């Protein structure tokens, strides 16, 4: 009789027993959850407005600064990128809402959309997600999380933002270089180019433009800001790919597995690490709910329950409840799995 282990859900945890968060955690919650969400929504509506102006009115949202490429080329390039980004976003929303309805902590943490929805409306769930990462002391797991989440969420960055930001960067450079050459009388153009080789020089040129054309300087400032954000994001993606190739992939594909032609998938490994961290967290904090007696199990001596089992596999007193569904009958059975089943590396028993 085969059985499948059902993962922990939010209703299995008493969120009221989660320790009070520090002010730094609350600040991170505001910045990384609410501020980023508002920024993404504003950028999305800005993209929609630009796309409508391009396709319906055959013009840019501003007529002051023209793109680096010809309008007939940049028009379809920008519109295609915006439409592609919107389609990817809709696809991610559909998958994210499906994951959100499952209420599984691990799958909700691994999906960016469902993780954001949970965090926006419940700070305690944000704390649970943070505890998953903070309780892992292994540097390899931290690099693994960084690499996985950067690579798994790179579609919109590569196909929706990168082509536009490259054109924005070239347009910004050409406008500033033109202004630099016009204002530097009696000097060679390469000397003017040298004034734009760092961020300080670019900002000074934008300040100079503001003296004669304030609206143009504002547009250039927003273009510069979005381009810097894109450079940071694409740098993180490149770093995550390098980390995956050099450090993570060799761990998955050892010499013995190469001979057998077997390779462990990244997503399954990340899910396993999150499950272990989550089990360790709820055990140490004692925040897991026992539905049968309306109390919590594990944790300190006041809430910890001991179970006696005749089987040697259940010799450890620290247990975690699991739910098994048998395929041949529609019945569920609650059993208490020992902690050593979640952390076999701490015990001498070998599990096949």
Swiss-Prot record:
It is found in: Cell membrane; Bud tip; Vacuole lumen. The chain crosses the membrane at residues 37-57, 77-97, 228-248. One of its GO terms (biological process) is potassium ion transmembrane transport. It is a multi-pass membrane protein. Disruption phenotype: Leads to high-affinity Ca(2+) influx system (HACS) deficiency. Causes a large increase of cell death in response to mating pheromone, when KCH1 is also deleted. Induction: Expression is strongly induced during the response to alpha-factor. Its main location: membrane. It catalyses: K(+)(in) = K(+)(out). One of its GO terms (molecular function) is potassium ion transmembrane transporter activity. Residues 58-76, 249-352 are cytoplasmic. Keywords: Cell membrane, Ion transport, Membrane, Transmembrane, Transmembrane helix, Transport, Vacuole. Residues 1-36, 98-227 are extracellular. GO terms for cellular component: cellular bud tip; fungal-type vacuole; mating projection tip; plasma membrane; vacuolar lumen. It comes from the Eukaryota. PANTHER family: LOW AFFINITY K(+) TRANSPORTER 1-RELATED, PHEROMONE-REGULATED MEMBRANE PROTEIN 6. Low affinity potassium transporter that, with KCH1, participates in high-affinity Ca(2+) influx system (HACS) activation during the response to mating pheromone. Directly promotes K(+) influx and HACS may electrochemically respond to this K(+) influx. KCH1 and PRM6/KCH2 act at the apex of the calcium signaling pathway that is used for survival during prolonged exposures to mating pheromones. Belongs to the KCH1 low affinity K(+) transporter family. This is Pheromone-regulated membrane protein 6.
């Amino acid at each position: 009789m085969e059985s499948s282990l059902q993962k922990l859900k939010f209703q299995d945890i008493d969120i009221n027993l989660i320790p009070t968060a520090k002010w730094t955690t609350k600040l991170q919650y505001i910045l990384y959850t609410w501020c980023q969400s508002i920024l993404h929504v504003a950028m999305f509506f800005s993209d929609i407005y630009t796309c409508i102006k391009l396709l319906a009115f055959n013009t840019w949202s501003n007529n002051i600064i023209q793109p680096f490429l010809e309008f007939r080329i940049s028009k379809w390039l920008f519109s295609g990128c915006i439409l592609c980004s919107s389609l990817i976003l809709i696809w991610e929303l559909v998958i994210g809402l499906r994951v959100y309805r499952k209420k599984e902590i691990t799958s909700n943490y691994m999906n960016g959309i469902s993780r954001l929805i949970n965090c926006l409306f419940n700070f305690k769930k944000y704390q649970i997600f943070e505890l998953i990462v903070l309780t892992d002391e292994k540097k390899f797991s931290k690099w693994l999380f960084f690499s996985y989440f950067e690579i798994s969420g790179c579609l919109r960055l590569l196909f929706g933002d990168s082509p536009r930001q490259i054109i924005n960067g070239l347009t910004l450079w050409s406008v500033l270089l033109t202004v630099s050459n016009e204002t530097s009388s009696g000097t060679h153009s390469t000397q003017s180019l040298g004034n734009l080789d760092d961020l300080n020089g670019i900002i000074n040129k934008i300040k100079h433009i503001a003296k004669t054309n304030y609206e143009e300087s504002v547009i250039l400032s927003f273009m510069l800001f979005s381009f810097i954000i894109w450079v940071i994001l694409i740098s993180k993606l490149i770093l995550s790919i390098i980390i995956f190739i050099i450090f993570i992939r060799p761990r998955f594909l050892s010499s013995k597995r190469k001979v057998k032609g077997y390779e462990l998938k990244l997503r399954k490994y990340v899910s396993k690490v999150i499950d272990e961290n989550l089990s360790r967290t709820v055990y140490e904090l004692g925040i897991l709910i026992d539905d049968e007696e309306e109390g919590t199990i594990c944790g300190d001596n006041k809430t910890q329950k001991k179970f006696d089992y005749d089987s040697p596999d259940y010799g450890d007193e620290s247990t975690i409840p699991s739910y098994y569904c048998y395929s041949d009958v529609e019945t569920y059975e609650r059993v208490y799995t020992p902690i050593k089943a979640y952390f076999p590396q701490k015990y001498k028993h070998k599990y096949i």
